[in-house]
Every structure is written in C-alpha cells, then in structure tokens.
Amino acid sequence: MASIEFSPGIQEVPTQVRVLKSKTGNRGSAIFRFEDLKSDTQNILGMRMIDEEGELTTRNIRAKFLNGEFKALEVTYDMETEAEWDRFLRFMERFSAANQMGMA
C-alpha cells in the first residue's frame, strides 16, 4: 500500500495535488497541499512517499498562514528525469487507488 508521511507511522492524505511538466518534457513538479494534518507541524522536516518500490522524499515544504493562524502545508516534489517522472506516476497511481482519489 502506498502512503505519505511527515512523521514515521503517521499517514497523511493531501487536500490537493497539482502535477506539472515542462514543455520539453524533461522536468516535472508535483505540488501537494495539506490542510488537515495529523502530524505535529512544529517537527516536520520532510515528506516521504512510500510504496512497494521504495521511498521518494522531498524537503521542499512551505507553511501557509492567514492572520497568524496555520492554514496549510505546500510541498513540492521536483522530478529532473523521465525515470523520476515515471516512478512518481507509479506511486501516485497506487496512492490514489488506496485513498479513493481521482483526477479533475
């Protein structure tokens, strides 16, 4: 089963995922938005995407605040090669199936 974690053993589900690919097709990014976190937001250092193939990680995390109140985390996962892109898509297929997520 595929999962996303900020803290070991605490699975999270994003509110939104946007996937972007360059016009040349060489680079891509996935931007995850998390509004309702189970993890302690004070101790988040990175995001792990885990499935049967292994683990994908990123430390590109930004907290969003409104009037001093936490609203969301935005996490960016960058892909530099076609192999990284394909691996990410395989993870997202597994993750979306496990969490009843669809594409809009």
Swiss-Prot record:
It holds the Pfam family Psb28. Its main location: membrane. One of its GO terms (cellular component) is photosystem II oxygen evolving complex. InterPro entries: Psb28_c1_sf, PSII_Psb28_class-1. It is a peripheral membrane protein. Transmembrane segments: none annotated. It is found in: Cellular thylakoid membrane. Keywords: Membrane, Photosynthesis, Photosystem II, Thylakoid. The keyword Metal-binding does not apply. GO terms for biological process: photosynthesis. The keyword Thylakoid applies. Part of the photosystem II complex. Belongs to the Psb28 family. This is Photosystem II reaction center Psb28 protein.
